[in-house]
């Protein structure tokens, strides 16, 4: 038996990653700080609360010269990266937040705004309901097959849970071409 259900995600994540490279660490940190400030200004203008986003620590990677003859190692430059993870309470605003953050690409280079990814955090409650529906569907199909062959149904001898899948949603015209993680609605499917 098969059961399907269209479910709206209850959590959205938008990642903003910005980086720079410079021979002077202070200049690189200043550049990162400016990008962080611009991201936070947009989040404040959209009235997101501080508990709806998280600023990750700055990551600094020095790049060294590779001359084997020299006894001392020399730092050529620094790669500096930081990210902000946004998890809006109202996931309906995710597209609006994403579009507004995209404007930063006009001002800053080396900035990636990742499309919102949507998650169903309470998936277990849907699994149980789908298993019940799929089992009922299997029983109904078995009865129909037996009627065609003029047989009667006996007791249930065995049942195996098959696949549980999260499939892309084809009903949301705005996101129909997006990958499943980037769709707010998902199609859950259970087979028994």
Locate predicted features.
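Short, charge-dense linear interaction motifs
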Residues: 1-192
């Amino acid at each position: 038996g098969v059961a399907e259900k269209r479910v709206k995600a209850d959590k959205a994540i938008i990642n903003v990653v910005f980086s720079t490279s410079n021979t002077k660490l202070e200049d690189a940190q200043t550049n990162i700080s400016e990008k962080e400030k611009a991201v936070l200004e947009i989040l404040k203008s959209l009235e997101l609360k501080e508990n709806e986003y998280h600023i990750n620590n700055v990551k600094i990677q020095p790049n060294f010269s590779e001359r084997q003859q020299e006894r001392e190692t020399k730092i050529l430059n620094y790669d500096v990266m930081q990210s902000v993870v946004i998890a809006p309470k109202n996931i309906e605003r995710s597209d609006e937040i994403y579009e507004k953050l995209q404007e930063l690409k006009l001002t800053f280079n080396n900035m990636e705004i990742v499309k919102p990814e949507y998650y169903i955090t309470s998936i277990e409650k849907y699994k149980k309901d789908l298993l019940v529906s799929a089992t009922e569907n299997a029983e109904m199909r078995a009865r129909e097959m037996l009627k065609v062959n003029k047989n009667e149904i006996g007791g249930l001898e065995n049942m195996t849970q098959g696949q549980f899948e999260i499939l892309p949603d084809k009903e949301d015209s705005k996101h129909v071409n997006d990958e499943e993680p980037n769709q707010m609605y998902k199609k859950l499917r259970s087979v028994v």
